[in-house]
Structure formats: C-alpha cells, structure tokens
Swiss-Prot record:
UniProt family annotation: Belongs to the DNA gyrase inhibitor YacG family.
Gene label: yacG
UniProt entry tagged with the keyword NAD: no
Bridged cysteine pairs (disulfide): none
Function field: Inhibits all the catalytic activities of DNA gyrase by preventing its interaction with DNA. Acts by binding directly to the C-terminal domain of GyrB, which probably disrupts DNA binding by the gyrase.
Pfam families cross-referenced by the UniProt entry: YacG
Protein residues bound to Zn(2+): 13, 16, 32, 36
Keyword Metal-binding belongs to the record: yes
Protein name: DNA gyrase inhibitor YacG
Alphabetized GO MF terms: DNA topoisomerase type II (double strand cut, ATP-hydrolyzing) inhibitor activity; zinc ion binding
Subunit structure: Interacts with GyrB.
Length: 69
C-alpha cells in the first residue's frame, strides 16, 4: 500500500521570518518560538501595532458603581 503524501502548511514567523510548520504540535504557531511570541506581544504593549477603526467612548463609572463589580 502506498503512503499518501500530505503537504504540510508552512508559514513565516511574523517576527523573524523563519519557516514554521503549521501543526497542532507547534504550541507557538504562527511564531517559531516563545521568544518570537513575546517579542510580538511586547510590540502590541508598546503601541507598535494598532487596529484601525474609530475609538469608542466608554461610559464613566462612579465610585459607588465600582463597589459592586
């Protein structure tokens, strides 16, 4: 019986551009490592990345309202 060859999906790590196989075993996908994942997270925290759209104002919460949350 011949084995069927499945094409494995490869993507580039968004941080370092290394080829990464997209499989459930890769806990860091789409990143190649925990390090690249944390570098990306730091970029979001520093405001390097943004999501376009309009800013929505939030209702103000008074001190008594906060006691019930």
């Amino acid at each position: 019986m011949a084995e069927s060859r499945q094409t494995r999906l490869q993507v580039k790590c968004p941080t370092c551009q290394t080829a990464v196989v997209w499989e459930p075993e890769n806990a860091f996908r789409p990143f190649c490592s925990q390090r690249c994942k944390l570098i990306d997270l730091g970029g979001w925290a520093d405001g390097k990345y943004t999501v376009s759209g309009q800013t929505e104002s939030l209702p103000e919460i008074s001190e008594p309202d906060m006691a019930y949350r």
